């Protein structure tokens, strides 16, 4: 098991959640949620957190249909991952994110009821779930 810092993204066409984690502990925490327009974020905001955290690896959630097939947003998430690599030179891993948003909503509701279910919290928590799920698959 290595001690890499890993950043996770929950890609969406209107909002993108971010989380940061350590491979050695297999845990992550939410960082932020960024507004996007048709899947395109404000790259200066993304650059800021990448410079601040300097991740060794970035995991991008891959939105698939429940049967494992791809959908339009799957292609957009792959483009986002490719742009992250191209702009910042970071190593990228794609990870199946099916049901991460459902799990994030359940987790947040359990902790704080309906008030905790704002979109930013859900997206950042989804990024945590994607990242921790990726850690589990590695070991």
Curated annotation (Swiss-Prot):
CDD domains in alphabetical order: YqgF
Annotated Gene Ontology cellular component terms: cytosol
Key words, A-Z: Cytoplasm, Hydrolase, Nuclease, Ribosome biogenesis
InterPro entries reported in the protein's UniProt record: RNaseH-like_sf, YqgF, YqgF/RNaseH-like_dom, YqgF/RNaseH-like_dom_sf
Protein's UniProt name: Putative pre-16S rRNA nuclease
Keyword Nuclease belongs to the record: yes
Gene Ontology MF terms in the entry: nuclease activity
Top class in the EC scheme: hydrolase
E.C. code: 3.1.-.-
UniProt-annotated location(s): Cytoplasm
Domain of life: Bacteria
Family: Belongs to the YqgF nuclease family.
Naturally occurring in which organism (per UniProt): Proteus mirabilis (strain HI4320)
Biological-process GO terms, alphabetical: rRNA 5'-end processing
Protein's job: Could be a nuclease involved in processing of the 5'-end of pre-16S rRNA.
């Amino acid at each position: 098991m290595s001690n890499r810092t890993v950043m996770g993204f929950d890609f969406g066409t209107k909002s993108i959640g971010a989380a940061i984690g350590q491979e050695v502990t297999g845990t992550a925490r939410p960082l932020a949620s960024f507004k996007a327009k048709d899947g395109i974020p404000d790259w200066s905001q993304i650059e800021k957190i990448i410079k601040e955290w300097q991740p060794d690896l970035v995991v991008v959630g891959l939105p698939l249909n429940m049967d494992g097939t791809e959908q339009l947003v799957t292609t957009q998430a792959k483009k986002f991952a490719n742009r992250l690599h191209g702009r910042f030179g970071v190593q990228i891993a794609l990870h199946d994110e099916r049901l991460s948003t459902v799990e994030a909503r359940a987790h947040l509701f359990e902790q704080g009821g309906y008030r905790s279910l704002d979109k930013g919290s859900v997206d950042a928590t989804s990024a945590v779930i994607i990242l921790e799920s990726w850690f589990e698959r590695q070991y």
